[in-house]
Amino acid sequence: MVDVKALADFEDDDAAKEDIYRLEGFYLGGINSLRGYAPRSVGPKSGDFTGQEGAGIDLGGNFMVLTNLEVTFPLVQEAGLKGVVFMDMGDTWSRLEPVKFRDMKLTSGVGLRWLSPLGPLRLEWGYKITESDDVSDTDKSRFEFSIGTFF
């Protein structure tokens, strides 16, 4: 089965300027968005405004684009075990800019899905095709585990 998810969202830029340390805003990274990137690691940082790009406090973006493509297939149908191959692409920005696909974060990977008695379990490995802007997120790939659904 092939699943595609596409999201684009924005937050009122003038309202966002009033919140210096806001918990809201758009962050990407982690098993439910850009797999392969650390959770909430993709987005503007305070260092981006002081010349230390990719360093500092996570600020969250005002604009966000995310696309996920998955192909799932049965591995052990009687047990409810499935395999998944995926590709994710997205980014967040502090101000509206033309979207350049060559600058978007891109990941791919594989995983296992099991419909257990506890609910859907996911074990996925994501690999960064593009480099991270976050100086603290130096891993090229990461394993992640989740209980619950994605699509």
Locate the predicted segments by residue:
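Strand-loop-strand
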Residues: 95, 99-116
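Low-complexity, flexible helical/coil segments
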Residues: 40-46, 104-107, 118-125
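A short, acidic, flexible beta-alpha connecting loop/helix-capping segment that sits on the rim
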Residues: 127-131
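Short, conserved loop/turn and helix-capping segments at secondary-structure boundaries
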Residues: 102-103, 137-141
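Transmembrane beta-barrel architecture of outer-membrane proteins
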Residues: 64-68, 105-109, 142
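Outer-membrane beta-barrel "beta-signal"
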Residues: 110-116, 121, 139-151
